[in-house]
Design a protein with these regions (language model features):
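A surface/extracellular/periplasmic glyco- and lipid-processing/surface-interacting theme
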Residues: 1-245
Length: 245
């Protein structure tokens, strides 16, 4: 999602892969709460904006706040500048979640998989995806035909995963368009419930359509549909959602 001054913020969702080290962990955002709820996840954060923290402290969704467990579940990594130096690992999160009596069973239903070869034509080829965030946060994804993935660049440079020392990649890139409103002079809230336009990129092609998430239910699933109203099937692999306003 995006902050008022154009800085982009990540939210990582771990389901199949459990990395040993997770970070940097940053503050909770109001926009992320509906997304975390929709994926039936435990929301891990380091403090947060006032409205988001109020909701989380009232138990709107299961969450683990590093402000309460620094030095035990979370730690500050040496050599990494503040505030980017907050880290943890998946086992510590699972142990603390169990102590808090959170449900550790994954109940998210997932997305339908596309097992057939995607149909390509001159109108749907997509070797590149450009997301025009404000400088220096602009993003470019380039399709790697050999590995059938998209590789991420930020501000013209490859985005590197520090754990794997490899360029960040995704099997599917979903760009969803939405709107935002100001909470106050310091924070905006980006609409992550309701719906809007979307473009799905996978296998070197683009699929225009819509995203929908029922605004009446916080834990509703985030759906992706093509322009015929049919749910889009994804190639097996990781999905990166770019939210633009």
């Amino acid at each position: 999602t995006i902050t008022p001054n154009g800085i982009t913020r990540f939210m990582a969702i771990f389901q199949c892969n459990n990395p040993t080290e997770i970070g940097s962990i940053r503050s909770a955002r109001n926009d992320f709460i509906p997304l975390a709820a929709g994926f039936k996840s435990i929301y891990v954060h380091w403090g947060g904006e006032r409205e988001a923290l109020q909701k989380l402290n009232n138990g709107i969704i299961d969450n683990v706040d590093a402000m309460k467990y620094e030095g035990t579940v979370f730690y500050r990594k040496k050599g990494v500048p503040v505030p980017h130096n907050g880290f943890t690992d998946i086992n510590k999160i699972l142990d603390q979640s169990q102590k808090l009596n959170y449900n550790l069973e994954n109940t998210f239903t997932g997305y339908p998989h596309e097992e057939k070869e995607l149909k390509k034509n001159i109108s749907n080829l997509a070797s590149e995806v450009v997301v025009d965030y404000l400088d220096p946060y602009g993003v470019r994804w380039t399709y790697d035909r050999q590995d059938n993935i998209y590789k991420r660049e930020r501000d013209g440079n490859p985005e590197i995963d520090k754990n794997a020392n490899e360029q960040v990649s995704a099997k599917i890139v979903a760009v969803i368009k939405t709107t935002s409103t100001y909470l106050n002079q310091d924070y905006i809230t980006v609409k992550t419930q309701g719906g809007g336009e979307a473009i799905i990129y996978q296998g070197g092609i683009s699929i225009p359509g819509k995203w929908k998430k029922d605004p009446a239910h916080l834990d509703s699933k985030l759906y992706f549909y093509d322009n015929n109203g049919k749910e889009i099937k994804f190639l097996p692999g990781n999905i990166w959602v770019e939210i633009v306003i």
